[in-house]
């Protein structure tokens, strides 16, 4: 009986590690939100007030994170953490005072790149 229990424990723990390696399936809701994220990053206007723009973008990315985590697609949830950090740093800098156009443009390009990577990963699933 102890052998059977040991075999069952090993088999079940092996299955759980295999399941972590299998990518999650395509999801229409995630595809919509990542397209919104791409669009929002492309439309950041460095000449306008950045706080509301960054707040809206942060809210979208946070929605994606909550949805992916709640749904259990942890492979997709890991993707947004870097983008959330970038947005938070950008928000903190915008709150501290005026931002140079070059800094804003560089952060915008980074956010566009991060949104594109997330979108390609999310929409490239089947």
Task: Give residue spans per PLM region.
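Non-transmembrane, amphipathic alpha-helical segments
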Residues: 22-29, 46-53, 75, 96-103, ...
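Bacterial Sec signal peptide processing site at the extreme N-terminus
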Residues: 11-32
